[in-house]
Amino acid sequence: YNEGDKKFKIFQGGVFRTNETNSFKSLFPPSINHAISSRIALQVYQGLVGLDQRTLKVKPLLAETYSISDSGRLYTFTLRDSIFFHDDPCFDNGIGRMLNAKDVKYCFDQLCSAIDGNRTSSYLTGIVKGAKEHYNSTSNSQIVEGGVEGIRVVDDRTLQIELISSYSYFLKILTQACCAIYPKEAYEMYGKEMRAHAVGTGPFVLKNKDVNEDVEIRMVKNDKYWDVDEHGNNLPYLDVVKISFNNNKKIELTNFKKGNLDMVYQLPVEELKAVLVTLDSAKAGGNPEFKLQSNKDNGLSSAFYCFNMLNPIFQDIRIRKAFNLSIDREKIVKYILKGESEPAIYGFVPSLGEYDHTLVKGFSYDPELARNLMIEAGFKDGKGFPEMELDISESNYLNIIVAEAIQKMLFDNLGINIKINYYSLSVLIDKFTNAKSD
């Protein structure tokens, strides 16, 4: 802390406890394609750049600086000096070595390759020069000599990435967990086991290696971490982060009230009134049990349903439109989500910064038009239409009550029967990744 300035005194140490209502799928960066794995992995790994948690603007991480050519196609990154990987048996004498530009190229080449478990290659293959060709030429988990043409090591601290054309959002892609950097030695030693054996450069070190999905995760402070706060204090402040896995939001809230957890990500909607009395009362300090800290920015979360386009029924655009027009999004937001969301009537991307979502022609609630479309498709009042199955996460109460509302709307408006199936997140991801859901 700043000596003599009590306002900026920083307390070091302690254990931070939180819970996830779904288990993680994998902590191997190219395999990370959902939020829970990403939240955990980004405590252990880092990428060239990251997002500022308050402004959501891109900020340098492993890259100390970066520049963009006038054409917008060539990005040059200069790495920070003296950043080290976590100590791990994959290194000589178990001591983590210094990060260099070859590590970054190795990881990005992997991301653009057909290696086992790579679920995120599309982040770069359509953008980086030579990435698609590299992916198509890889097989049997082997990296082609020379790697991706557009990813070049200039020297130990300098890397260049050449794009096919200018992409304004390229830096934000690099903030994703799949673009995090890990050492070649770790992949060569652990292979598929990197799903739970993470070796990175981040503020915390994963201690319980080879954990199962439902076992508590324990991460300890990285004593060699490079970053400091605005006052020069070494980061992170915490000694330990513990993450448990319990899919019952009510039990999670009970543990929070008892002091067994330090944070919950979301309050169950049905518990909002009981916990906060009312949001207005809590903001005014009227609740003696909790103090409310409010962030008025939109959360980076969108909820949407996907059609399985391999199902012949949904290959008819009239049916897809009818489903869309039968859902009263504003009613769901007002009465089920208690106003704590925004109806996606202009596409599912909310207004952010300079982006005005009202320019998108979306779908408003129009059950009459929906019924006419179903008649055109040959399914008046739902007659002859097969029962559809909607697969959702079993651990998120909001998902369940929204799904039940949509189930009722589709039956009331179109006469369509929907069966809701509840799965763990890992099973759910497998089902929609392999087109096993409707």
Spans of features found by a protein language model:
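Short, well-ordered beta-strand elements
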Residues: 12-22, 74-77, 104, 159-160, ...
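Structural transition elements
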Residues: 204, 314-315, 342-377, 394-402
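Extracellular/periplasmic solute-recognition and catalytic clefts
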Residues: 207-220, 244-310
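Gly/Pro-rich hinge or "lid" segments in bacterial periplasmic/extracellular proteins
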Residues: 53, 133-157, 162-236, 240, ...
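Ligand/substrate-recognition segments at binding pockets and active sites
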Residues: 353, 375-438
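Aromatic- and charge-enriched surface segment that lines or borders ligand/interaction sites
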Residues: 64-123, 160, 252-255, 313
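A structural "hinge/loop" feature
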Residues: 22-38, 62, 89-95, 120, ...
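N-terminal lobe/hinge region of extracytoplasmic solute-binding protein
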Residues: 19-70, 199
